[in-house]
């Protein structure tokens, strides 16, 4: 009998100094150990700059340099997406970096990969939200809903 699929789901809500509750969701699905993995990640895209070329460029760079290193790379995805775009940060008097007004929606990415053949499939959903927060130390990516 093949092993049962292993799900890892984490959803954390925390109080934000000026925006109330923040929801951080991370989902990792491991199926048949290393043969097949389904990972959900949150990518940020905004307005006119959410073109396919830039999105594909971010995805390619992320897959090459970060995707294979860790099971849960939502923080790295967010950091890379931010680093490839010109964005202004609103520094708070704590460990958080916030951004508002630049991102009318985020892209929720489901990445399905078969490791032996190295074939990846992306399913994308657009999710509206008010802003985002990134912890400066551990680089975790939070949504301000």
From Swiss-Prot:
Protein's name in the database: Uncharacterized protein YGL118C
Species of provenance: Saccharomyces cerevisiae (strain ATCC 204508 / S288c) (Baker's yeast)
């Amino acid at each position: 009998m093949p092993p049962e699929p292993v799900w890892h789901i984490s959803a954390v809500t925390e109080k934000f100094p000026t925006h109330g509750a923040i929801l951080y969701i991370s989902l990792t699905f491991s199926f048949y150990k290393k043969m097949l993995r389904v990972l959900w990640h949150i990518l940020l895209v905004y307005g006119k700059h959410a073109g396919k070329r830039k999105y594909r460029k971010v995805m390619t760079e992320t897959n090459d340099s970060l995707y294979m290193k860790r099971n849960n790379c939502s923080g790295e995805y967010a950091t890379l997406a931010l680093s490839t775009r010109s964005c202004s940060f609103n520094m708070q008097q704590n460990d958080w970096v916030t951004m508002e007004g630049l991102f009318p929606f985020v892209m929720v990415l489901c990445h399905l990969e078969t490791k032996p053949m190295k074939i990846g499939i992306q399913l994308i959903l657009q999710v509206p939200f008010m802003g985002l927060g990134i912890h400066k130390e551990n680089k975790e990516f939070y949504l301000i809903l």
